[in-house]
Amino acid sequence: MNDTSIIILAAGLGTRMKSKRPKVLFELCGEPMIIHILKQAYAITNDVGVVLHYEKELISQKIKEIFPQTKIYTQDLENFPGTAGALKNATLSGKKVIVTCGDMPLVRSTDLMRLANADADIAMSCFEAANPFGYGRVIIKGGKVGAIVEQKDASEAELAIKSVNAGCYCFKREILEEILPLIKNKNTQKEFYLTDTIKIANERGFKCVAVNVSEQNFMGINDKFQLSVAEKIMQDEIKQDLMKAGVLMRLPESIFIDSRAKFEGECVLEENVSIMGACHIKESIIKSCSVIEDSVIEGSDIGPLAHIRPKSEIKNTHIGNFVEVKKGVLDGVKAGHLSYLGDCEIASGTNVGCGTITCNYDGKAKYKTTIGKNVFIGSDTQLVAPVNIADDVIIAAGSTITNDVPSGALAISRGKQENKAGFFYKFFGKNNAEK
């Protein structure tokens, strides 16, 4: 829809979140709520702007990382507070202008499209609320919107109305430009309300209609409890879509999946699995209580109780319980248990014994460990990086490897065992006959 502009209002302080962090940067399913609504906005137009004030630079930086083309506007909260005041400095360029909120991350592009396609000069979203407290009441007369009355300014009769303002609007641009300068702040909060556009539009004979929407999709987030409710809704949607696409989940209610994660082929997620960040998982099994972060997993089985940290690429590999991989590239490897494999590259056919550690950090910098094909690493081995282990190598159990190992070699680095006969009885002052 190249003829449509979208303005997202995100200038509020979000005091009910009780945090120094801006409200719109709180995450749902791994991504800030402002990013969720931006994704939906860009699904229908390339003309998108965000109105900011509190922590403008911080929010703008996060937005620009993902959507650099986004227009950033600043609201003058001192002189023009309120939702209409937010549009004071915004550039309105499309034939239609959709105005929505940055704290409604469950809104879908299809919802915005319905507003844009409405046969009206102004279309506003509304729903029948089970509990309308806190919402602006929508006064509908003859199928048209007569007025919107904010909770703070509503009479007893108006408070009984359950049809409420969901917070999104679509205006014909020329009408919005005509009406905005006419809005006054003559209300208890001394704010410029966007809802007043309805009253003014009706006075001027413009057509204002209500578009009924889902209360769930238009849920606003004002505190951390509402954040948790919205995240559960989004999690359920993500998991339902994935299961319908062929991903098998054991106890799906216990699983967390980031909204950026992608799955391909037949995958299994067991209970209490967390898939964090932009993971790509293909034809793999992730066993119970495992955590995968920003990594690529293909043709592998991971866990249980494994931790795959960011920038890992694991292919055709078995990762067992209590194994941690960080920034590791593993192809055709077996690492069964109790190992740390950080900043490493391990080739096919290699077996990593229990208790193996890549010692990748010297207190100042991280170093890489490279392990070739068909290497057998005995239990309780320390590989002190930087170090290269060639193909076809055996590392003896209990070794600390500090130098490169050539192909075909046995590397052993440990003290020679010595057995002192009778030492137990001497040490504890016991006679051998007393046993």
From Swiss-Prot:
EC numbers, comma separated: 2.7.7.23, 2.3.1.157
Subunit organization: Homotrimer.
Cofactor(s) the protein requires to work: Mg(2+)
CC cofactor note: Binds 1 Mg(2+) ion per subunit.
Protein name: Bifunctional protein GlmU
Binding, acetyl-CoA: N360, Y361, S379, A397, R414
Keyword Ligase attached: no
Organism expressing this protein natively: Campylobacter curvus (strain 525.92)
Family: In the N-terminal section; belongs to the N-acetylglucosamine-1-phosphate uridyltransferase family.
InterPro entries registered for this protein in UniProt: Bifunctional_GlmU (IPR005882), GlmU-like (IPR050065), GlmU_C_LbH (IPR038009), Hexapep (IPR001451), Hexapep_transf_CS (IPR018357), MobA-like_NTP_Trfase (IPR025877), Nucleotide-diphossugar_trans (IPR029044), Trimer_LpxA-like_sf (IPR011004)
